Structure formats: C-alpha cells, structure tokens
UniProtKB/Swiss-Prot annotation:
It holds the Pfam family Reprolysin. It comes from Crotalus atrox (Western diamondback rattlesnake). Ca(2+) binds at residues 200, 284, 388, 391. Residues 21-190, 394-414 form a propeptide. Zn(2+) binds at residues 333, 337, 343. Binds 1 zinc ion per subunit. Snake venom zinc metalloproteinase that causes hemorrhage by provoking the degradation of the sub-endothelial matrix proteins (fibronectin, laminin, type IV collagen, nidogen, and gelatins). This is Snake venom metalloproteinase atrolysin-D.
C-alpha cells in the first residue's frame, strides 16, 4: 500500500467588517483576511510539482467552512501558443513560451452544485468563486505574512464613478447578412445540449495598455491570462472551450490608428487582422484591448454574428477596470456578439446572476449567459454552420525558443 502524506489545513480568519483597504482590484470596504493552506495527497517522498494538476483549499467565508476544489485549466492555451511584441525599431519579436506547467485553474465549491471558480495560483490565490449564488473575489495581501489573502464581494469594491457603462454592437456590416429570427429556425426553447465547439483566441494589447502598465510585458501577460481564464469559465455553460493562441503587445507603437471613435477603431482593427495577423497566425477570433477612453461611454464594440469571418471575427474592449473579473465579463460579452448573441434587456437576470449580454455593465452577485443568449448562439450555429470552431486545439509540450529578429527559431539555435 502506498503511504500517503496528508498536508492538513491550518488557517485563521480575521474579518475586518467596515474597514477599508486598497487592493489590486481597487478600494474594498468589507473583507475577510484568511490564511489558506493546501491539502495535498502525495506518495511519501514524491516530488511535488510547482503547479499540481489538482489542488484543494479550505476557507471560511462568513464564518462557514468552504472547501475549494481546483483543477488546472488545460484548455487555456492552444498547442501553438505564441507571444509577440515589438523592439524599439519596430521588429516583431515572437516566441513560443512553455505554458504546460501554468498556474491557472478552474473549480468548484464542495457541496454546492451551482458553484464555480476561476483562480490564478501564480503568486498566491487570485480570482473568484461563486458560493451560494454570490460571487466572491480573493487576492493576496501585501503583508509581511505572505500567506494572507483578502476575500470580499464584488459589490464591496468602491465604484470609480456612477456613469453608465455600455456596449456597442454593429449590425450594418455590408459583407454579412442579418441573422434570421429564432422563430424562422424552429428552435426548441428547452434545448440545452449545445454541441462542443472550440475558439482559438488572439488578444492584442495596444500601446496605451503597454504604457499604462509601465512597459511591463509580464504584468500585461498575467492580466490577459487571468481574463481569458475567466472567459473560458463563462463559456463552459455553452459547451465552448476558449483557448488563447496568441498574445500580441504593441510595445513600440500602435499598428493601427487607435481612436476614441470606436467604430473607426473597429474598422481599422478589422483591416489589420485580415491583411496582417491572419497571414502569420491561424486563429478564430481576435480581441483588441485598448486603454483609450472610447466614445459615448462605450466599453466595447463587436460586429454581430461574424465568428470565423476572415475580417470581422473581432471585437474591441476598453481596459476600463482593475478588476479582471469585470474585464472578463466585458470581453466575453463582445465575443458573444461575434457568436450571434444580441443584447438582453437592461434588467436581465438568470436566477440571481446578472446576464452577461446586458447592454450595460454593472456589478452583480455573479454573471451568466441567459437562456436567450443560448438560443441566439444556437440559431447562429444552425444558420451559418461556422467551420473554424469545429477543430479542437489539443495541447502539446511546447519548447521555449530563443529569438532573433522577427523570426521564430528552432530550440537551441544560436
């Protein structure tokens, strides 16, 4: 019999009711401080990997014990994941970093069938979990005790302003015919078994994003990875796997004219994607992350029903919040438009959750796609039968490669 070493949980909880603290996610009014310790079952003497395939933690939330089960999100990166940035003289620098032993997880709460979790374990635990219908955020505290974490509700992060935050959607692309009404396609409103589909996503961060994060490529990389991990979690309810296949950072200058006029920027991004990006990187959809303030309180813009179109399978998203969860909701929303989803009503709820396809973004207990969004997506599949999302982006063991100029090099090249 294999001897098993059990690392037990020891944690203390110190609620700071009514206190305020400045965290990476913003100024938080009400939070708990916890010291989570991992439960690990390994054969005696076994070498523990840096990031295990499965992990388990215990927390106390509102005084009640919570067991958090986490599983590495092996769908997060495609087999040919790459990263591109630019040298000061404009040369493309492209690498294929090894991401097999990454630190991004999805999971659930024990004894809560409706629970979900999307967590980064890169430096402590950071992300969110849904418990009894309520969304909680967790992130490390910068204290002398490195094990301290804050747990808080999204609603307890102070609002930066009260202005309405809206999404734009364009339906007047001449190259794409309008989507038929659901009633024309004889959809079954009770049908929940959607087919498995796969989206290989490219995220492009513009030069303002690069400057906003102090020209730190690693900070931008981590932020985008966490956002896509959240998006991947949202789309599991639709049986869609979203994998990041490329991250491009415009580190020297923007490759297109970025304007506050969101429609003009979207048009320019569409042209660049078709004439440049698609010629060097196979993918299904590209989203532009920009730090410019878009016009008319717009947080994002995307054409409707254009997934797999060589020009229009795109969206733009303003980097509007330090809360990665809200950024994930915004980008998932724009991606939803590409998949044929129209806006829900402004007060749409699915149970206690806010609908992801609401026209405006507000903080809520949790976020989900509505039944209407599922039906819009299903009718898009029936009408257009998009082919690019049929292939499964299987993971392989990539090898980190040195770089010279704008070319990918073989491992070990000098």
């Amino acid at each position: 019999m294999i001897e098993v070493l059990l690392v037990t949980i020891c944690l203390a909880v110190f609620p700071y009711q009514g206190s305020s603290i400045i965290l990476e996610s913003g100024n938080v009014n009400d939070y708990e401080v916890v010291y989570p310790r991992k439960v690990t079952a390994l054969p005696k003497g076994a070498v523990q990997p840096k990031y295990e395939d499965a992990m388990q933690y215990e927390l106390k939330v509102n005084g009640e014990p919570v067991v958090l089960h986490l599983e590495k999100n092996k769908e997060l990166f495609s087999k040919d994941y790459s990263e591109t940035h630019y040298s000061p003289d404009g040369r493309k620098i492209t690498t294929n970093p090894s991401v097999e032993d990454h630190c991004y997880y999805r999971g659930r709460i024990e004894n809560d069938a409706d629970s979900t979790a999307s967590i980064s374990a890169c430096n402590g635990l950071k992300g969110h979990f849904k418990l009894q219908g309520e969304m909680y955020l967790i992130e490390p505290l910068e204290l002398s005790d490195s094990e301290a974490h804050a747990v808080f509700k999204l609603e307890n992060v102070e609002k930066e302003d009260e202005a309405p935050k809206m999404c734009g959607v364009t339906q007047n692309w001449e190259s794409y015919e309008p989507i038929k009404k659901a009633s024309d396609l004889n959809l079954n409103p009770d049908q929940q078994n959607l087919p498995q589909r796969y989206i290989e996503l490219v995220v492009v961060a513009d030069h303002r994003v690069f400057m906003k994060y102090n020209s730190d490529l690693n900070t931008i990389r981590t932020r985008v990875h966490e956002i896509v991990n959240f998006i991947n979690g949202f789309y599991r309810s639709l049986n869609i796997h979203v994998s990041l296949t490329d991250l491009e950072i415009w580190s020297n200058e923007d490759q297109i004219n970025i304007q506050s006029a969101s429609s003009d920027t979207l048009n320019a991004f569409a042209e660049w994607r078709e004439t440049d990006l698609l010629n060097r990187k196979s993918h299904d959809n590209a989203q532009l992350l920009t730090a410019i303030e878009l016009d008319e309180e717009t947080l994002g813009l995307a054409p409707l029903g254009t997934m797999c179109d060589p020009k229009l399978s795109i969206g733009i998203v303003q980097d509007h919040s330090p809360i990665n969860l809200l950024m994930g909701v915004t980008m998932a929303h724009e991606l939803g438009h590409n998949l044929g989803m129209e806006h829900d009503g402004k007060d749409c709820l699915r149970g206690a959750s806010l609908c992801i396809m609401r026209p405006g973004l507000t903080k809520g207990r949790s976020y989900e796609f509505s039944d209407d969004s599922m039906h819009y997506y299903e009718r898009f599949l029936k009408q257009y039968k998009p082919q690019c999302i049929l292939n499964k982006p299987l993971r392989i063991d990539p090898v980190s490669t040195p770089v010279s100029g704008n070319e990918l090099l073989e491992a070990g090249e000098e």
